[in-house]
């Protein structure tokens, strides 16, 4: 009995021992295709550090961090990022792609809140829509509803800067993590973010297993297309946003996906690392010349875009 007490005290002392941020330098998962995140650990610790690099367009040397404290281990000294106590059980997902990644590992039941419920097609989310909170869109967030959902974590994304939700979430004491999947240059890099979300819910091993099969299947299809003799159809992307039409860079994952599928992206002027706005007249001209038009939102006819426009 004395031995057991001593062991318990030793364990408690080890668990409560503080660590330095610099101790979390052992790679727990090294992404093969994604460049926007890394998962690290410290020797003798169950807690992990998820770092997200340059999480929005135009970000330069920006890193946001989420410390996932496990087994009651304390936050490292000097850490000023977000802290998640244990695995996330209640998640608010601000993008439908976050839900798709959680769905890939069978964990959508953890989603308690979303942005734009009517535009999410996931069967589990729609089956539970009466119990899922729609917190609204950035710039018009229902924070009272968000608080009532009692989330462990909010999954965010940034467009041309930090999310407008960030400061309010800090004020409310709600942890968040940026998901920069859409900034990846390859479809496989985008897909690999499911491993980062798997870590957040304590299912990294499952996430790694699910992802491992994706490059195999993707590259097999890519090889099949490259061996076919065909004329590449020209492809237009996206829909109007206000008075502009945002066209992805030729290095964007969506354009890479089109190329790998045997298509020809119609707009080659943007070779940077972010989408660029063009005026509606140029966009409509491109669309009229394209063989295909993808990512058209909820529209099923061109009239939905041409009839409201006086031009």
Regions found by a protein language model. Name each.
Residues 1-19:
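Bacterial Sec-dependent N-terminal signal peptides
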Residues 90, 152-154, 162-244, 268-269:
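Extracytoplasmic substrate-binding proteins
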Residues 14-99, 206-235, 302:
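Bacterial Sec-exported substrate-binding components of ABC uptake systems
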Residues 87, 97-101, 107, 142, ...:
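Stable alpha-helical elements in mature extracytoplasmic
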Residues 48, 54-147, 153-158:
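A short, structured surface patch at a secondary-structure boundary
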Residues 224, 230-304:
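Flexible, glycine-rich surface segments
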Residues 305-310:
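Conserved small/polar residues in nucleotide/adenosyl-binding loops
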Residues 97-100, 117-119, 159-163, 182-187, ...:
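Solvent-exposed loop/turn segments at secondary-structure junctions
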């Amino acid at each position: 009995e004395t031995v057991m007490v001593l062991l318990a005290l030793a364990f408690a002392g080890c668990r409560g021992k503080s660590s330095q941020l610099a101790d979390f330098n052992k790679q727990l998962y090294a992404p093969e295709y994604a460049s926007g995140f890394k998962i690290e650990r410290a020797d003798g610790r169950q807690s992990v550090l998820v770092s997200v690099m340059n999480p929005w367009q135009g970000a330069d040397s920006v890193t946001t961090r989420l410390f996932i404290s496990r087994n009651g281990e304390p936050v490292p000294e000097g850490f000023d990022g977000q802290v998640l106590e244990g695995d996330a059980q209640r998640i608010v997902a601000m993008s439908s792609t976050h839900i798709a990644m959680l769905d890939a590992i069978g964990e959508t039941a953890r989603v308690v809140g979303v942005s734009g419920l009517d535009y999410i097609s996931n069967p589990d989310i729609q089956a539970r829509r009466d119990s899922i909170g729609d917190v609204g869109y950035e710039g018009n967030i229902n924070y009272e509803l968000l608080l009532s959902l009692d989330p462990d974590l909010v999954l965010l994304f940034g467009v041309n800067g930090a999310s407008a939700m960030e400061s309010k979430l800090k004020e409310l004491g709600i942890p968040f993590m940026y998901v920069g999947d859409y900034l990846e240059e390859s479809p496989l890099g985008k897909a690999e973010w499911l491993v980062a979300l798997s870590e957040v819910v304590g299912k990294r091993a499952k996430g790694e297993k699910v992802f491992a099969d994706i490059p195999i299947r993707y590259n097999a299809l890519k090889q099949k297309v490259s061996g076919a003799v065909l004329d590449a159809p020209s492809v237009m992307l996206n829909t109007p946003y206000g008075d502009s039409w945002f066209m992805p860079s030729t290095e964007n994952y969506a354009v890479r996906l089109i190329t790998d599928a045997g298509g020809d992206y119609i707009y080659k002027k943007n070779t940077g690392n972010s989408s660029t706005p063009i005026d509606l007249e140029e966009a409509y001209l491109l669309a009229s010349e394209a063989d295909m038009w993808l990512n058209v939102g909820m529209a099923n006819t061109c009239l939905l875009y041409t009839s409201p426009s006086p031009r």
